[in-house]
């Protein structure tokens, strides 16, 4: 059956997997508890966020006022929510690699000139694709200078923030104080069947076929962007992909709010200088689509997202299924139904005596055919049914979740055998090592550095080929 028939479209299929694996409930719970206790650094650690800034050094070098403003924002940063909303790419829904996204901007006086303004950015960064093991995020400061503090101060690893993926105008996507704004900014405050205000027909026809663009919100979001630039009307650029862009003109027509229309691209090539509508404002919020199509229940979303999109939703704690870890499983063995289960921390055949097991293992070592129970145990070690879920968790950095699944199947004392499962765990460990070398400046393009290894293979992934990422 086509993906479109199962999940509405391939985009929803992609986001279903992302919401299931990318930000596990255990991460949300731990990060929330630490943030609520005032431990913002601990919350970042729980959410897989590396902190590459030193507030004490900042206070000495730039002044205590700037450091206090940044500290206030960090105390309310929900790093798990930031991970939830950061841009992702198809086909696996991983974080967009090599991204530098502005979370907040701080204007400070530059030197002795009271009229000169210097802007410091609080940014979130993702590693390049070849070093994305663990899907970790970094927090840093960027001020446009070639000097800086911490690992990311190096210009090679500290690129200019991407205007397309800025989040300083969308603080509700990471600031716990403003998450209620998500309902209005996503359009969730309007019923799906509500008649939209009249829009320019050319504007409605502009998005590519099959893309879920928030066209009805573009005028309001363009207004927010222009006001941040000190204007109320003007033109903004909208990027719909790598090869499709359009110019949106926001003009006042009468006493109402400014209306948006498709504008002509500047003939002098100045389109690149136009303000860029943030990517978070271009597309329909995936969580809203998932809820409205019935693909997920509010309880499976991030609690801050669920409370904003579905205000009458009562949090019931982490959703889960009955825990079958360690429960015996049935195997058809020589005309009978036998059990295999955990004994002393390893997976074993429960309905065969030890002497028979030793005899069958010796037979298998001599190239014979072992008992079906032993074949089932061997298959569980090499290529278990849960392999896809383990792989997804490892790819998204949830090593603890992946090991919990493996230990629930094979036992905590199991010795993994050669096969796909061990290969996936070893590959994940190597990717984490590569990330550590990158963080230390010991791997990456350049003389004297270890050349990046090949990226993880994709051919084994049964993902929709036409999946789209926000």
Residue ranges of predicted features:
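Extended acidic, Ser/Thr- and Pro-enriched interaction/regulatory segments
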Residues: 160, 164-166, 170-273, 281-282
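Ordered hydrophobic segments in well-structured contexts
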Residues: 96-105, 118-123, 136-140, 235-237, ...
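N-terminal membrane-targeting/anchoring modules of bacterial envelope and secretion proteins
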Residues: 1-209, 214-216, 410, 415-470
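C-terminal structured domains
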Residues: 239-470
């Amino acid at each position: 059956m086509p993906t479109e028939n199962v999940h509405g479209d391939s985009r929803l299929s992609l986001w279903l997997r992302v919401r299931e694996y990318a930000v596990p409930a255990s991460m949300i719970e731990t990060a929330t508890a630490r943030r609520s206790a005032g431990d913002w650094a601990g919350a970042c650690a729980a959410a897989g966020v590396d902190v590459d800034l030193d507030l004490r050094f900042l206070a000495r070098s730039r002044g205590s006022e700037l450091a206090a403003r940044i500290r206030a924002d960090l105390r309310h940063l929900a790093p798990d929510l930031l991970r939830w909303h950061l841009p992702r790419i198809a086909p696996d829904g991983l974080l967009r690699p090599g991204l530098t996204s502005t979370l907040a901007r701080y204007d400070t006086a530059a030197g002795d000139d009271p009229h000169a303004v210097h802007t410091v950015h609080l940014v979130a960064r993702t590693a390049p694709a070849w070093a994305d093991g663990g899907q970790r995020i970094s927090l840093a400061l960027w001020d446009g200078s070639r000097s800086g503090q911490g690992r990311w101060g190096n210009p090679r690893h500290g690129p200019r923030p991407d205007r397309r993926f800025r989040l300083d105008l969308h603080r509700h996507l990471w600031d716990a104080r403003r998450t209620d704004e998500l309902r209005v900014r996503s359009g969730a405050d309007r019923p799906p069947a509500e008649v939209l205000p009249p829009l320019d027909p050319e504007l409605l026809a502009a998005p590519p076929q099959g893309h879920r663009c928030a066209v009805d919100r573009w005028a309001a979001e363009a207004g927010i962007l222009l006001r941040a630039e000190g204007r109320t009307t003007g033109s903004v650029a909208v990027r719909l992909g790598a090869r499709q862009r359009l110019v949106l003109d926001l003009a006042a027509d009468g006493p109402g709010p400014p209306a948006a229309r498709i504008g002509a691209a500047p003939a002098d090539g100045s389109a690149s200088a136009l303000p860029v509508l943030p990517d978070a404002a271009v597309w329909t919020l995936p969580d809203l689509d998932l809820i409205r199509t019935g693909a997920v229940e509010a309880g499976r979303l991030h609690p801050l997202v669920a409370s904003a999109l579905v205000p009458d939703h009562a949090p019931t704690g982490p959703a889960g299924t009955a825990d079958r870890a360690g429960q015996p499983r049935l195997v058809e063995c020589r005309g009978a139904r036998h059990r295999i289960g955990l004994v002393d921390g390893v997976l074993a055949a429960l309905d065969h005596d030890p002497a028979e097991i030793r005899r069958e293992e010796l037979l298998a070592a001599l190239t014979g055919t072992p008992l079906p129970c032993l074949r089932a145990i061997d298959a569980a070690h090499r290529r278990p049914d849960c392999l896809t879920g383990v792989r997804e968790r490892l790819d998204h950095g949830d090593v603890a979740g992946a090991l919990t699944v493996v230990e629930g199947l094979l036992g905590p004392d199991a010795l993994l055998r050669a096969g796909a499962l061990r290969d996936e765990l070893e590959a994940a460990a190597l990717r984490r090592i590569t990330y550590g070398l990158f963080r230390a400046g010991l791997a990456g393009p350049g003389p004297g550095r270890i050349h990046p290894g090949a990226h993880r293979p994709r051919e084994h992934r049964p993902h929709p080929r036409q999946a789209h990422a926000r």
